[in-house]
């Protein structure tokens, strides 16, 4: 309650440009998360800032003679990185805010731009390894051998025909980009 002013259905924080923290859970969980952030928030923020800077300076090697285009490319790099998450292993969300789940085919289509052209080969390899763990391995299943179409915390769907071939294509692309044929 401290530092907030209520305006109708809106809330204005009194903490200026530093933003605000929102937690969800029991009161005890929320207090624990806030205390954790208070003790390490500045360090976390500095680490995040360093990560974003390295994404832009080390991984985004595309530069033009148009500053506005360069800025847009930087934003695309950072925005795409925000979609790389940990849910059921490492993966790429299909899109936020509505598609905060892994769609196999979409993930494999976006992987070159999200990971490979930026040189984040270890992340791409981990995504493939983690998604391979979700393969249907039940010989009695009608979707036996398939890579999921969709994976979220509620379950896994195998209702696609192109997810598995796209998985194989991306494994080949990771090998081609990284030179690592033994991963």
Where are these regions (language model features)?
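Aromatic-rich carbohydrate-recognition surfaces in CAZymes
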Residues: 100-107, 111-183
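Acidic/polar, glycine-enriched structural segments that form the non-catalytic walls/loops
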Residues: 1-100, 181-183
């Amino acid at each position: 309650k401290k530092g907030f002013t209520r305006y109708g259905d809106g809330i204005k924080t009194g903490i200026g440009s530093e933003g605000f923290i929102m937690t969800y859970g029991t009161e005890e969980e929320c207090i624990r998360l806030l205390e954790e952030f208070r003790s390490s928030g500045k360090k976390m923020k500095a680490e995040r800032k360093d990560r974003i800077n390295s994404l832009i300076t080390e991984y985004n090697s595309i530069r033009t003679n148009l500053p506005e285009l360069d800025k847009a490319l930087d934003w695309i790099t950072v925005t795409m990185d925000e979609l790389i998450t940990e849910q059921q292993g490492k993966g790429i969300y299909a899109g936020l805010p509505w598609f905060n789940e892994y769609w196999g085919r979409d993930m494999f289509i976006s992987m070159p731009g999200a990971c490979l052209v930026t040189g984040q080969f270890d992340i791409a390899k981990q995504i493939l390894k983690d998604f391979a763990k979700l393969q249907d391995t039940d010989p009695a299943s009608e979707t036996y051998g398939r890579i999921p179409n969709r994976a979220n915390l509620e379950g896994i769907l195998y209702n696609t025909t192109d997810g598995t071939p796209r998985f194989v294509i991306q494994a080949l692309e990771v090998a081609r980009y990284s030179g690592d044929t033994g991963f």
